[in-house]
Amino acid sequence: MDILYIVPALITYIVGYILIKYPISISVPTERGMHKNNIISSGGIAILVGIISFTVLAGLDKYSSSFHNYEIIYISALMLVTIIGYFDDTRSLSKKFRFGAQIFISYLALQTTSISDPFLILAAIILIVYTINIYNFMDGIDQLAISQAIFFAASSGLIFWWENFMFSLIFLSFFLINYKKTKIFLGNSGSYLLGLYVAVAIISGPRETIYEEGALISMFILMTIFYVEATYTIIARF
């Protein structure tokens, strides 16, 4: 592992503190919220910058200063979902627009995979949209969302492919910003981003390894507790 790949985590940490010093979004307490005071939000932008920097470094190293469509489409999807999340943080987008945007972004993200069967594409879109929304639902509960992302990325990275482990360092750097005291929330920009990342990693992960069938099952196992807890909470709440 090249030492340069630590840079994205440092960039995430720095951008996180820049967002704290110069806030672009504020989360105001609500009846359903877990916080009582205004908290700086949209921390997902720091994570996005870290992911982009990692992708650039990895792309330049792997492809000798060139990028494949995979990287371009993947980053585009992450950027779009983060932007949608940011506007939802600051302007409260309508449910129909959010849902439509999530479906479009999910379909775009699937262009980075080898899925071609219409039924599987539909199932994958449902998984991605659902994962985005449960991440959004569970965000803000004692760093639960970012902690699960760290666990998922680190575990899948150690088991299957190292790129995911590098993502865990980016997530960890954001976690450390809020370690002793919450300074900045992920916001919808961050929860949407993490949801898309996790879902696409589950769907596309098997193609990166010789353990194709076992990989898909294993990736789901890594997220089982989070999926079950979030689903149960949603059912119990409504």
Task: Give a label for each model feature.
Residues 1-231:
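"…together with the soluble PPM/PP2C metallo-phosphatase catalytic core" -> "…together
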Residues 231-238:
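Juxtamembrane interface at the ends
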